[in-house]
C-alpha cells in the first residue's frame, strides 16, 4: 500500500511522491449528500500544489454559486457537475452560461450502462442523448464513469461513449475511469480518444506502478 493514512492530503502526497501525479478528482461525499463542503481539505490540497477537480454535488447554478462561499472556485482545476446531482436537463446550459469562465466537467454517471439520474425529468434519455445535452451546453470536459466498474479491476465499460464524444466534439477533454487495472487498459483508453483516466485501486494495490 502507498500509505496507511486516511488523511486526504497525506494520501495525495503519497501518490504524488510515488507516481508524480498532481491532478485529483475529489468527490466530497458529504457535500454530494447535501452536507457541508470540506473546504479545509480542498484548501489544503490546493495550497500544497494539487490541481483539484471537485465534485461537491452541485446540480444547478445557485448551488455552484453557493459552493463559491466555501471554496475559491478560481483555485480549482474545474468543477464537476455529476448527472446524479442534476434534476433537469436544461440546468446544464444554465450552469455553463452563468459560469462561462469556470472550467467545468460534466460527469455521465452510469450503473451497468444505465444513467443514474436525479428525478423523473431524465426518464427516456439514453447515455448518448445526455452527452448531446452536455456538449451543446458547452461543457469543457466530459467524465464517463460506470460505478459498477469502480474498484472491480474488470476493465473499463465506457469505451463506446468515449468514441461517441470524440466523434461529436474532438476538442472536448474526455476522461473515464472505473476498472482500470494495467498499462494495457490505459493504452486502450488512449486508443478510444481518452485524454485522461481516473485510477485509484490499481495505484493503491500496486498493479500500476
What are these regions (language model features)?
Residues 28, 54-58, 83-85, 106-110, ...:
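A cross-domain feature marking catalytic cores of carbohydrate-active enzymes
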Residues 51-75, 160-196:
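Catalytic cores of alpha/beta
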Residues 1-49, 62, 74-76, 103-106, ...:
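Conserved N-terminal beta1-alpha1 strand-loop-helix module at the mouth
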Residues 92-98, 186-209:
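C-terminal helical cap(s) of enzyme catalytic domains, especially alpha/beta-barrels
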Residues 53, 80, 105, 141-143, ...:
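A structural signal for isolated positions on well-ordered beta-strands in alpha/beta enzyme cores
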Residues 32-36, 87, 205:
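Acidic-and-aromatic substrate-binding clefts and catalytic sites of carbohydrate-active enzymes
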Residues 16, 42-47, 68-71, 92-100, ...:
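Surface-exposed amphipathic alpha-helices with a cationic face
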Residues 64-114:
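Hydrophobic, well-structured mid-protein blocks that either form specific transmembrane helices
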